[in-house]
Amino acid sequence: MAIKVLVVDDSSFFRRRVSEIVNQDPELEVIATASNGAEAVKMAAELNPQVITMDIEMPVMDGITAVREIMAKCPTPILMFSSLTHDGAKATLDALDAGALDFLPKRFEDIATNKDDAILLLQQRVKALGRRRIFRPVVRPSTPTPTPRSSASSVLGGVSTHTQPAPAPVRSSHAASIRPSGKQYKLLLIGTSTGGPVALQKILTQFPANYPHPILLIQHMPAAFTPAFANRLNGLCKIEVKEAVNGDVLRPGCAYLAPGGMQMMVERTGVTGRVKVLAGSAEMNYKPCVDITFASASKAFGGDVLAVVLTGMGADGREGARMLKSAGATIWAQDEASCVVYGMPQAVASAGIATQSISLDNMAESILKESARG
């Protein structure tokens, strides 16, 4: 049966176009539309949609308030539409905090002109969120989307991704069963996409100010959003969190968030490292791209890396993680049950690259134990 969708927006044009696009996919069906948050709350309870697309700025009741009420009364996967502005970014992060699972930039021109990429992206996101029921606090997984058309190995060049021996199967673990390896690290990498903002906040807020290593964060996010996200994390965390700037020298206890619309790489400079922020190849689907950052870290730091792949659509991170593992690095993945979308972690785990599959609730403790100086 088709996934039932409720479309919520105060613009009649946007409601109509989103409905048309959703209904073009035989796996999706718009069952109703609403023009404000109050209508959305009522319809969510009465119609039991499997996915809701939600605008933020609406009369009567705004989207953020509607998300809070829906998640309290009848939890439903919600995809937010957000303007590409500083205020829009802050509001979107508030909506994610309230319980929304994902967001898309609200680009009227792309929607109006039937741009193929925009249509496919909207359909993929709605299907990804609608393929499972939502339970709180644990969210059930979805099916991953296809692999990006360009891998980091082809863009960076010179690093084989197929030279390692067949790895052992991934083990599903809880923090209590994870014993620190005693390995000495110089860098922590975390890559994520759908569901990442909430997951990163949950993990990083548990880190002490004296966390012993630099941290590179790669979150699929537009350029207008990453400054607001970095600022929000910095205000919530004991460690410092900043949007990465080209030339940043890596410091322990500091997390560097890859800027949206750019690629973040790292190079070795003596005992530490330095961030390189580049426009990157137009061939890459993702900017920032987890594969790009992971692959550069494999060259710069070799096996002295702990890399974690969190919830997200697609397979970004798999090839970069393969390079890291070939260099001797440790690779972990978020487990299926705690992912918003089990795509990126599944790609790493099913390829035998990840040595541990860890729940989000236990991830911070596990990282801290593994990272401890000993």
Curated annotation (Swiss-Prot):
Top-rank EC class of the record's enzyme: hydrolase
PROSITE patterns: CHEB, RESPONSE_REGULATORY
Keywords: Chemotaxis, Cytoplasm, Hydrolase, Phosphoprotein
UniProt-listed Enzyme Commission number(s): 3.1.1.61, 3.5.1.44
Residue ranges, compositional bias (Low complexity): 138-155
Residue positions of the active site: S193, H220, D316
GO BP annotations, alphabetical order: chemotaxis
Stretch list, region Disordered: 138-177
Localization, UniProt: Cytoplasm
Location of the CheB-type methylesterase domain: 181-374
SMART domains per UniProt: REC (SM00448)
PTM comment text: Phosphorylated by CheA. Phosphorylation of the N-terminal regulatory domain activates the methylesterase activity.
Short name of any one Pfam family annotated for the protein: Response_reg
PTM annotation (4-aspartylphosphate): residues: D55
Cited InterPro entries: CheB-like, CheB_C, CheY-like_superfamily, Sig_transdc_resp-reg_Me-estase, Sig_transdc_resp-reg_receiver
Reaction it catalyzes: [protein]-L-glutamate 5-O-methyl ester + H2O = L-glutamyl-[protein] + methanol + H(+); L-glutaminyl-[protein] + H2O = L-glutamyl-[protein] + NH4(+)
HAMAP family: CheB_chemtxs
Protein name: Protein-glutamate methylesterase/protein-glutamine glutaminase 1
Gene name as annotated: cheB1
